Structure formats: C-alpha cells, structure tokens
Amino acid sequence: MNASRSIFTVIAAMFVAAAAAPAHAIQFGLKDGPGAKFNNDDLALMMARVDAGLKSPTEGEVLEWKNAKTPASGSVVPLNKLTWNGMSCRRLRITNVYGEQKAQSVYKFCEKPAGKWKLVGPDNE
C-alpha cells in the first residue's frame, strides 16, 4: 500500500468516525461540514494534495485542489515539521470547501517506521 492510499484510508476512516461520533464530528467539522458532502473523486483530489503537503520541503506553500465536476475544492498548507513521541511529524492546515460551506483545521501527521504517514489527530498547539 503506498503512502497516498494509506493517508486516503486514514482520512476516509476519519469521515466514518465523524459520522459515528458526533463530538468528534463537531471537532473535525465533518458531520455538518463540507467534507461530509465529498464524493470519492473529491476525496482523491484532496488526498493527492495531503500527500504532496507531507512531502513538500516548503512551509507555507499553498497546494490547492478543485473538482470541476462538483462544488468541492480546498487547499493544504504544509506547516512545520516536528518530533512527537519519538516520531517525525508534519503539521498541515487543511481547508475544505463545498459550495459556500468552508471548514479549516490543522492536523498532525506522523511518519511510521515503514515510511507510511498516520493521522495523529487535530493539532491544537
């Protein structure tokens, strides 16, 4: 499984968890947020930018995406790299838009020994 597919699986799981756990849904902005309306193509476009953000050497670079077939769009901004619990991590600001609805949060991803990235959760630091 490549890193993009692994991250896609994590984000998809996050959407499922949001539907099952209303408190987390509010925190992530997924239950009633724009991401709840994303189709598979929207998610794939977003995940390609998440993958690019994790690999980007540049902090603050805005990586935008848009699905021409839906009102879905967004951006990923790579923030700082850090060490957390002994793992190499990266913070990303992820903005999701669906029509007029917009949500933005900062998430922490950490690289596992096999080179796969894992979503650790929202980053409140």
Predicted regions and their residues:
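N-terminal trafficking/processing presequences and adjacent post-cleavage segments
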Residues: 21-67
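Hydrophobic/aromatic beta-strand elements that line small-molecule binding cavities or substrate pockets
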Residues: 76-81, 93-95, 105-110
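Extracytoplasmic
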Residues: 60, 87-89, 104
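Short beta-strand edge/turn micro-motifs at domain boundaries
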Residues: 113-124
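Short beta-strand segments that buttress and anchor functional surface loops
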Residues: 64-65, 91-97
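Bacterial N-terminal signal peptides
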Residues: 9-18
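Surface-exposed, charged secondary-structure patches
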Residues: 69-88
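Positively charged n-region of N-terminal signal peptides that target proteins for export
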Residues: 1-5
